[in-house]
A protein has these predicted regions:
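N-terminal targeting leaders
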Residues: 12-17, 26-137, 163-169, 173, ...
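SH3/SH3-like beta-barrel superfamily modules
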Residues: 68, 132-162, 204-236
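Boundary regions of SH3-family modules and the immediately adjacent low-complexity/disordered segments
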Residues: 84-102, 153-184, 197, 225-259
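Beta-loop motif signature
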Residues: 112-135, 185-214, 268
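Aromatic- and glycine-rich peptidoglycan recognition patches
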Residues: 168-171, 175, 190, 198-200, ...
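Active-site nucleophilic cysteine motif
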Residues: 260, 272-291
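...with weaker cross-activation on analogous glycine-rich loops/strands in unrelated enzymes
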Residues: 295-359, 365
Length: 393
């Protein structure tokens, strides 16, 4: 055999077996990665079924016959469970998972200082609007990225706030703020002014649901302090003492209808939860909040609250104030998916935010009939008469 031909064949055989070994190793790594990912998912489903309200983002990679864990979680037990679930693989495990909150040298509690603060999905102004938080509401700081803070709202929702949206409070300042009497804004929109007259320059705007501290009364005006220390005057009829409002506010079908109808024509805003703009669940959340009941943020979260009401094609079992949920019905290929919510009024009428806050009807005979709503109806939940998650600040 020609010597060169022999060497060439030998090189090809070596190359073939080398590639085969690499292929087998890659397959083994892929299988191993799949096992690791399955363990991570199992732990996630146990400790953080909803990452909109729970911090848990853990990944793993395989390097040099070892497992490297990285990411973050708010559950110490989840870290332990992840490591224990991977021990059977008999590989060295490097734990680089961060435990949150781990905030050093800052005050971890903040109070919203502007009428409506925009919470975003990522730390940049161009990021998707996730939700909004109103003036006077507390937030918990979980982590920081430059001028952005990853925070948790009072309904547990997570997202990013810019640093000028809120004021961080020391324990002493927080105690002082909490001890002050609060004024709860019931008007849809109002201006805090420098002096007690309507021609005075503005200090800030406020919207329904905003909370400020009350300092004194001046005839038809009330002297208030904002969370960041700014002061000014509000018309006395723009709100009520918060403790009195909370004590005397009794949510019922009529009050739900009244507040809901007062928002007719308000613009739709994805991620909005204020009178400046609201999405479907932001609308229902706002209506119930102004009646003293705190709902979860998103439609599919709200669908987990209250008592389910069985309905027929005439919707005769529904009562005013019930929440109606819409979306994709379950089929053999896909699970049920709730994407819209509205409030039932009467005679088939549903008030909801879609483009703007409006009333549609579920009956084909009605002038304001919505075929889309009827075809996508999934379920109804009754929040009243039970008072769930009473609004706290």
């Amino acid at each position: 055999m020609n010597h060169n031909l022999y060497l060439n064949m030998k090189r090809q055989i070596i190359l073939f077996f080398s590639l085969a070994l690499i292929f087998v190793a890659c397959q083994n790594n892929d299988q191993l990665q799949n096992k690791i990912n399955a363990s991570l998912l199992k732990v996630k489903n146990k400790f953080a079924k909803d990452t909109r309200i729970t911090i848990h983002s853990v990944s793993a990679k395989i390097e040099n016959n070892s497992i490297i864990l990285f990411g973050e979680t708010e559950h110490k037990d989840s870290k332990k469970e992840i490591i224990n679930s991977l021990k059977y693989l008999n590989l060295k495990i490097y734990d680089s998972i961060k435990f949150l909150p781990k905030i050093e040298n800052i005050n971890s509690i903040g109070i919203i200082r502007i009428s409506v603060a925009n919470v975003r999905s990522n730390p940049e102004e161009s990021a998707e609007l996730s939700t909004q938080v109103l003036m006077g509401m507390p937030i918990v700081i979980r982590k920081i990225s430059d001028d952005w803070f990853y925070v948790q709202t009072n309904e547990k929702y997570l997202g990013w706030l810019s640093d000028d949206s809120f004021v961080q409070l020391s324990p002493l300042a927080l105690e002082r703020w909490n001890k002050q009497k609060k004024f709860f804004i019931t008007s849809l929109f109002e201006i805090i002014r420098e002096e007690p007259n309507e021609k005075s320059f503005p200090v800030s705007d406020v919207v329904a649901g905003s909370i400020v501290a009350i300092k004194n009364y001046f005839g038809k005006w009330v002297f208030v302090e904002l969370p960041d220390g700014r002061t000014g005057y509000l018309p006395i009829n723009s709100g009520k003492l918060f403790d009195e409002w909370k004590l005397n506010t009794i949510a019922n079908a009529s009050s739900i209808e009244s507040v809901a109808k007062s928002l007719i024509g308000m613009p739709y805003l994805w991620g909005g939860t204020s009178i400046k703009g609201m999405d479907c669940s932001g609308f229902t959340k706002t209506v119930y909040m102004l009646n003293g009941i705190q709902l979860s943020r998103d439609a599919n979260q709200q669908a987990l609250e209250g008592n389910e009401i069985k309905t027929d094609t005439n919707f005769s079992q529904l009562r005013k104030g019930d929440l109606l949920f819409f979306g994709r019905k379950a089929n053999k290929d896909k699970p049920e998916k709730i994407i819209h919510v509205g409030i039932y009024l009467d005679s088939g009428n549903v008030i909801h935010a879609s483009g703007l806050v409006k009333i549609n009807n579920l009956s084909p005979q009605a002038d304001n009939y919505s075929e889309r709503l009827r075809k996508t109806f999934i379920c109804a939940k009754r929040i009243l008469p039970e008072k769930l998650n009473i609004l706290e600040v």
